[in-house]
Amino acid sequence: MAKVLVLYYSSYGHIETMAQHIVEGAKSVPGVEVTLKRVPETIPVDQARAIGVKVDQAAPVATVDELADYDAIIFGTPTRFGNMAGQMRTFLDQTGGLWMKGALVGKIGSVFASTGTQHGGQETTITSFHTTLLHHGMVIVGVPYACSGLVNMSEITGGTPYGATTLAGADGSRQPSANELDIARYQGKHVAELASKLAS
């Protein structure tokens, strides 16, 4: 049985929502075990609450060592100046021991993201994230254009061939759209299908 981990960091809930739909898509594939976890918050709790960070989230916090237990990992992060959030970076910077052992070599790695604006760095966030995964020897999986949501021209929407994305709005008021959530589910299903094939 293939094991898929959806691992995310979410400040205000947008990536958390996307992650839940990624999980939904992955769980639609028979014979795949799907786990949802998050990386630790690095902002002190009082400060985080003061700036509106969603501190209380249902997903348990992951440990670095457990990454080796999965056949595929789908990472989710908000954008910080075209890169992953510092909380995710801090978590991944602790994976040197896994790298030394080659513990993630041959496993699937996939990424989804959120930005505050339409041109806020969605694609650079995902592609720069890929660098870390490639150093670990992971096999990168995105979202193919077989996903019809990628060519939706009837609305402003996230979604890239590199991975699902959502636009949060500069003030965080915009929630993931139906199209963005469809792409997220597609990504989860696509990764799970490939993980199942690799694990068999």
Curated annotation (Swiss-Prot):
Binds 1 FMN per monomer. NAD(+) binds at Y12. It holds the Pfam family FMN_red. It catalyses: a quinone + NADH + H(+) = a quinol + NAD(+); a quinone + NADPH + H(+) = a quinol + NADP(+). It is an enzyme of class 1 (oxidoreductase). Its EC number is 1.6.5.2. Keywords: Flavoprotein, FMN, NAD, NADP, Nucleotide-binding, Oxidoreductase. Its cofactor is FMN. InterPro entries: Flavodoxin/NO_synth, Flavoprotein-like_sf, Flavoprotein_WrbA-like, FMN_Rdtase-like_dom, NQO. One of its GO terms (cellular component) is membrane. It comes from the Bacteria. GO terms for molecular function: flavin adenine dinucleotide binding; FMN binding; NAD binding; NADH:ubiquinone reductase (non-electrogenic) activity; NADP binding; NADPH dehydrogenase (quinone) activity. Belongs to the WrbA family. PANTHER family: FLAVODOXIN-RELATED PROTEIN WRBA-RELATED, FLAVOPROTEIN-LIKE PROTEIN YCP4-RELATED. This is NAD(P)H dehydrogenase (quinone).
